[in-house]
């Protein structure tokens, strides 16, 4: 990659069109790009890729990578496509029916013998031209998930200007209509009634085909130029064979060496493994490469004893320990000159997959529930499904903010169903200790195997190869899924697994994450993971009842597909004249499945339980209540069930791909609402929970303490109080000396029914450690009337059906309370931390109080933001503190407070 650091530094002075990548000699081409529709141009690639060509009428690209529609929007061709119906009404829906040219000029560094271009992601086909020469055609450059590396040495102009032109052909085919191309799909994440295929041909897709107007065409991952000597060092990885509890690691280092020359090259591959405070490991071996040869070279512990490491600093998921990382540096030296270098960060850890002995799901196939062990310890998974932006906008700061939210919530795994963006997310996850799951998208191209042609059968394993090579070295990469809802046919999954094995993938592999898959003989097959939802709102008692298959085992996805964001967020994408009543502008931003596409389930849940709303403000507030109690109960039940009954869940979904009502915990604008704080409460490492009278004859409610920390705990104190709506305490219980093993749960109390209480009453559960410090204050609102979804046969995964409904409408008549509020600010670890105090001087309860930190009295909340708690309840005579942290770059001046039975107020931060 680079011969000498000094020479490379000199090149930096002249090289104006790139940003320095993490490896010497590898530079990211980020600047001087422009875009044009091919139909608007007469010139061909040979002309466009010359420095004399004039870019008249081209659209400047503000930051690469970028897809076509993102570029056009950024250049003002279209208004904000995420507002109202703009995506449907303000942009031609057939942008994908034309080719698009990307063009850039850059100066290549001088002093190197070989140059390569790397394209990790082009969607879908492309011609590559440089300096008037075609480097590759659109039969070679095919596949959204295929990475391409092109030797451009003979066409590059070292030390002077070069022109790169890429002609992109978008995905053209429509599944179930005229075939497939192995790009990506938004499936029901977009409402295909509005966005996508509208039945203009004689055939119609089985479900529907949703897509944005350009079908996410373009260069959607970074483009790199690599400058090297005669031999390149590629795709390094370090694998770990870990013995526990002795804590001895046998490391194996792999890397590919490629000889660009037409003659043999002999040299030395040198390596170092280092970590601050640990002894550095030095490696070295001689290598001779044949002309044009690419060879995998390994440093194995049997030959290199220093690769047997005792008591290493292990990489752990952040919920289990520290995510310790080591550095590997490799260098190939020939003729006493550095030909190329490579650097990666890796973790010493083991990830193994297992099946338990549970026979509850024999109808799904053979074997028990899937689970993971990390470094020999059981890993309790509490995850969520992640999505990038709908236009695949490249935004590292946004990714960092989302991962910060993940840790604030207490989630410990993210799943990507295709949509595998750049390595930046994995690099952050390595550092933060957040495990990741990757695999192919359900239902459309990747699972329409009977519609694949010869090209698809070539592109599929090439795509697997490209993604595994990118992901395999990351400590955060835990699971690869060859299929989602379906099971690839035997020849295809055999090919996938062959590639995965060849590339030394040292993590878990599953062929499906569904419990409905069948093999080639028509027999049910599963990998121990269920995928049965629900995908719509459920009452708290549903999760604790113990009679629904969805609440046990290991689940790949389950959550609420109809999520109402905060009012501030809603107003950002729904125009003022479309805010109320709910209408088709809302539906455009919903999912596609029937009932969800009109937000039917969430409206039923809110209206039946909290009463019909007269305006959008009332509806949104009630929806936050519903989201809070549902999401909290979902995570609390998993914890209260203990390791034996529930080993893995993924919430559907973590975040939003655009401003949407499709399921999420964090909305598109990164505003945390009711679902967020319900999830955060349910994901506490230790907590005390109330099961909503869900079991038996419903005459008693269980109070359960769970422990999801890495250690056993003892000496806990539980206090449970019951309040009526007026604020009067009608029952008070305490339990001392509670102990719980890690990943365990203990029932500590049973509460009777309280017929003497109001029609809705509050159950307050507090947990204290052995020093009397409060760990949790968990407040529930419970109706005298129970929710009842009915028997398992009535449980429709995709929409809400209930035989009986709780009546929460008495909450609307709670006595009004005025809180005394003040706020002050300090700086902690580079964040502005605002301490907000809510004091209740009255004899009544102040319910569901949400604080928002703002720059101005009437401004929107500063985002992203991290509160230790929100939507809090303040009991009579008590004071609650909320700590809210925002970036040091922001200017917080005000706190706004809104509650269910308190007037909205704003106070200045002192």
Predicted regions and their residues:
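Accessory beta-strand-rich segments of carbohydrate-active enzymes
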Residues: 34-40, 59, 72, 92-233, ...
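Low-complexity, Pro/Ser/Thr- and charge-rich linker/hinge segments at domain boundaries
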Residues: 27, 185-200, 230-236, 349-370, ...
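Substrate-binding/catalytic cleft of secreted carbohydrate-active enzymes
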Residues: 400, 413-596, 609, 622, ...
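Extended acidic/polar, glycine-enriched regions
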Residues: 154-161, 254-358
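Short acidic/polar inter-strand loop motif in beta-rich domains
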Residues: 169-176, 333-339, 767-776, 902-906
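Active-site-adjacent substrate/metal-binding segments within catalytic domains
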Residues: 65-107, 112-119, 123-131, 135-145, ...
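Extended carbohydrate-recognition surfaces in non-catalytic/accessory domains of CAZymes
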Residues: 20-118, 198-222, 226-231, 356-358, ...
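Carbohydrate-binding surfaces of carbohydrate-active enzymes
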Residues: 255-262, 582-870, 874-884, 893-894
